[in-house]
Amino acid sequence: MLPEEQASNSRYFYELASARFGFSMDKVARCQAFHFKAGQGAKTGTGGHLPGRKVTPAIASVRGIPVGTTAVSPATFPDLATPADFKELADEVRGVTGGIPVGFKLSAQHIEEDIDFALDASADYIILDGRGGGTGSAPLIFRDHISVPTIPALARAREHLDSCGVGRGSERPVTLIVTGGLRVPADFVKAMMLGAEAVAVSNAAIQAIGCLGMRACGSNNCPVGIATQREDLRSRLVVDASAERLKNFFEASAHLMAVMARACGHHELRGFEPGDLTSWKRGVADLAGVRYAGARGRGAGEAG
């Protein structure tokens, strides 16, 4: 966690990954939400690897490791294995912070089983990361061939949460956040129609600030200065101008989503529902659990 970033943020999510680099309850106490990173859609089961050449004094200070040391994260939490283990730490976080939400980030694999694990660990929210999401560095075979694609993963997650009695309007609702390949307002709207209560973006955000999609994040040679520690390249990123572009992207996205909500007859974005969505592709309709738009082959549950 960068202290200056957290200090200027009123809604900061603390994500705890398996290596716990720089973790302390003092830092968590300054945040507004906390979640365990149990998986990432683009590199499930592989942990993390930050080359030593990227570990500058600033990064070393934040992570609590020597400058120039390669940082390797294990695939799983070494000291947390069962839902009870995670719940114990989650309760400690709530006690220290006065009860901030505690969640789980899950890659879209064994969706229902993983959600059950998170619920048993007392999750207040779930971030579901489907195939299609970005990563700075992962083997292509992982990025392109693992994880359930985001749309069917979202549909399954929404259905399962509702069946567990923790859906919207329940006594203890669990918030469903989705991410993974969602880039533009139309994607965000469709995700909310399928039951997501929030959408998280990363690739779209870095594109808004100038990413060219060169896919050189792991090389330390990002030509626009975003994913590099080389000072000659970092100087190419004009922070204030990039921040303005990012603000414009989010504001324009929210505006267009509001336009779509009004067109669907809703007074607010949370009014989106599956009935707002249809597909003329039979396979997509089946995967997403929405109405098929064709004139033939419509089942009884697809009328409308």
Give, region by region, the residue ranges found by the protein language model:
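Short, structured secondary-structure boundary patches
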Residues: 9-21, 146-150, 218-225, 288-296
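Terminal amphipathic helices with adjacent charged low-complexity linkers/tails
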Residues: 4-9, 121, 125, 129, ...
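Short capping/connector residues at structural and topological boundaries
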Residues: 60, 64-67, 77, 82, ...
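Phosphate/diphosphate-binding loops
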Residues: 6-39, 148-149, 158-159, 165-174, ...
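C-terminal extensions of enzymes
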Residues: 237-304
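Active-site-facing alpha/beta catalytic cores
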Residues: 1-92, 96-119
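Glycine-rich phosphate/ribose-binding loops and adjacent secondary-structure elements
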Residues: 74-234
